[in-house]
Structures are given as structure tokens and as C-alpha cells.
Amino acid sequence: MEYILIFISAIFVNNIILSQFLGICPFLGVSKKIDTSLGMSAAVAFVMTLATIVTWLVQTYVLNAFGLEYLQTIAFILVIASLVQMVEIILKKVSPALYQALGIFLPLITTNCAVLGVAILVIQKDFNLLQSVVYAFSTAIGFGLALTVFAGMREQLELVNIPKGMRGMAIVMLSAGLLSLAFMGFSGVDSGLKVLFGLD
């Protein structure tokens, strides 16, 4: 039940973009088309989950073991950058078609603060490895959900006549705010589930 709570909370209640405001750059920059947002979401899900596993292991068995906790941020950035490069090389060799589809998104993931944020959050929350994997994957799903829904909103906005003063970034920010308000409706769901299943 604890894992279900982590899953629901990471996707809806504490959405990485709409509640914690991490990953705003791809949220605004890659959300013009649903196709590109789905590609970015898939790439982020893969890298975020893999990076969280590796950074958790590095934190637990290297940084904590040798008293090097102060190197956490630098170590995590190096791990994420290395993983992205490794994934890019493997995809290029194994599946050129998938590499072509995701190739433009992979370099962007290195600078996506959501990936680093999740790696640090699992350490701060003192999650074990399995909890960390569930949290990272759930957060990636929440990232993809927010990105794809927002891309759908932006595609619909292209079809309507928007007043001149509201065009461009103004309507984008207003739409992002409305989407964030919609996700606020999920606040309290995790608390309700804890009470319902006696986990509080």
C-alpha cells in the first residue's frame, strides 16, 4: 500500500512540474506538439528512473561510506550526464530509428533539473532502493502527464482566435496556471488514502 501511495502522490498530488516547479524549461519549450511531448516524456522516464537507481547506489555505497556527502550535487550531475551520453551511444548502435525519434530530446535531459531534483529528493526522503525506483518512475509519469496534457491544451489554443495582447507567452503562462490549479484538486488525496488504509 505504501508503494501505491508513493505512486499516486508523485503523479497527481506532488507533481514535479505543477507542484514542485522542477522541469519548467521542457514544460514550456517542448510542449507545442503532443508528439514531441510524448517523445520527451519517454526519454525522461527512462533516464530519470535509471539515474535515480545509480545515484541512490552512489550515495549509499560511495558518498555515505567514505564521508563524501558534500560532493552529492557534483556526483549526481556527473552521473546523470554520463548516463545520458551512455543511453545516446547505446540507442545509436542498437536502435537507430528510436535514436532518431528521441535523439533531439536526449541532450536536453542532461540539463533538466527534474532529473537531478528527483535524485536528491529520494535521498532527502530517506527512501530505500525500491521506494526510490517507484518514486522516480511515478514522478516521470507525472512529468509526462503534465507535459502531454499541456501540449494538448497548446494545440487547441492554435485553433482559436486569441486576442492580440494575450498571444504568445501570455496565454501559455495563463494555461499553465489553469493546469496547475486543476492538479491542486488532487491535494489531500494521499492523506485520505492514508486514513482509509490506516497508514497515518
Segments (PLM) and residue ranges:
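Juxtamembrane boundary at the C-terminal end of a transmembrane helix
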Residues: 2, 182-200
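Structural signature of hydrophobic alpha-helical transmembrane segments
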Residues: 3-18, 67-82, 134-146
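Hydrophobic core segments of alpha-helical transmembrane domains in multi-pass membrane transport
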Residues: 6, 13, 44, 49, ...
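Generic transmembrane alpha-helix signature in multi-pass membrane proteins
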Residues: 21-29, 88-94, 103-106, 113-126
